[in-house]
């Protein structure tokens, strides 16, 4: 049987996806390499909704260690923020960075990042887009972080089985990684309650031997920012897990 006309297109798209995954992993290593100094502002996005421009190579030459000794002394903690597209990952990062929300849903084509200083360490949060072509690469980043935040749209009953499947893959990848599951959009009509989400995500029986937390949140584009109670609780829990 002769090959279908779509065959070459599928192969080309597959190759492009593989290249994208490799680039994402290289950027991750360059951006979040432990002990390496960066020169981007807090909350700057690389490939996300805020900007489509990558920093030029001559903009991130290594800093002189004597110029910023205090920054060099701070340890780094890495948090990976994942979830299906539309679950609220980008809005969550914008709130933590103190940026105003963006109206409507703007999908992340690549990743966004935020660096937040604390008294004893700096927290780097990396969001990878939740579209189907990017989910394949999620597992490559799990072993590089200290905590996983998994965002779930509490109103998206149709795709909840997909979210459960992706979450299970990540949990299997690193059995010891602390996981914070954020049940987002709890303020909307039709949102599943916490008991329903525990059942649908398989949390009641599967993960008794590891640190898995399920928190309710209402991280909406029109929300009140970092002062939103759900966001504050998530941040406090992250600090406890990272300390």
Swiss-Prot record:
Its name, as the record gives it, is ADP-ribosylation factor-like protein 10
Q: Name one GO molecular function term.
A: GTP binding
Q: Which InterPro entries match?
A: ARL10 (IPR042951), P-loop_NTPase (IPR027417), Small_GTPase_ARF/SAR (IPR006689)
Q: Which UniProt keywords apply?
A: GTP-binding, Nucleotide-binding
State the family named in the UniProt similarity comment for this chain: Belongs to the small GTPase superfamily. Arf family.
Name the Pfam families for this protein. Arf
Q: Which residues bind GTP?
A: 83-90, 127-131, 184-187
Domain of life, per lineage: Eukaryota
* Tagged with keyword Endoplasmic reticulum: no
**Species the sequence originates in:** Mus musculus
């Amino acid at each position: 049987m002769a090959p279908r006309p779509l065959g070459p297109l599928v192969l080309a798209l597959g190759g492009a996806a593989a290249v994208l995954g490799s680039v994402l992993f290289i950027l991750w290593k360059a951006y979040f390499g432990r002990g390496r100094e960066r020169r981007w502002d807090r909350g700057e996005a690389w490939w996300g909704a805020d900007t489509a421009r990558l920093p030029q190579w001559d903009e991130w030459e290594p800093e002189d260690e004597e110029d910023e000794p205090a920054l060099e002394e701070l340890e780094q903690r890495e948090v990976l923020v994942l979830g299906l597209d539309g679950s609220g990952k980008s809005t969550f990062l914008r709130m933590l960075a103190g940026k105003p929300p963006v109206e409507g849903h703007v999908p992340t084509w690549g990743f966004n990042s935020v660096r937040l200083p604390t008294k004893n360490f700096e927290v780097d949060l990396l969001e990878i887009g939740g579209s189907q072509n990017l989910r394949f690469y999620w597992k490559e980043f799990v072993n590089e972080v200290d905590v996983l935040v998994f965002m779930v749209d509490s109103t998206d009953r149709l795709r909840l089985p997909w979210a459960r499947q992706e979450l299970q893959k990540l949990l299997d990848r690193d059995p010891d990684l602390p996981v914070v599951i954020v049940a987002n959009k709890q303020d909307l009509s039709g949102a599943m309650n916490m008991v329903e989400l525990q059942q649908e995500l398989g949390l009641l029986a599967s993960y008794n031997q590891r640190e898995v937390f399920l928190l309710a949140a209402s991280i909406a584009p029109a929300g009140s920012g970092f002062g939103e109670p759900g966001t504050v609780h998530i941040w406090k829990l992250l600090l406890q897990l990272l300390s």
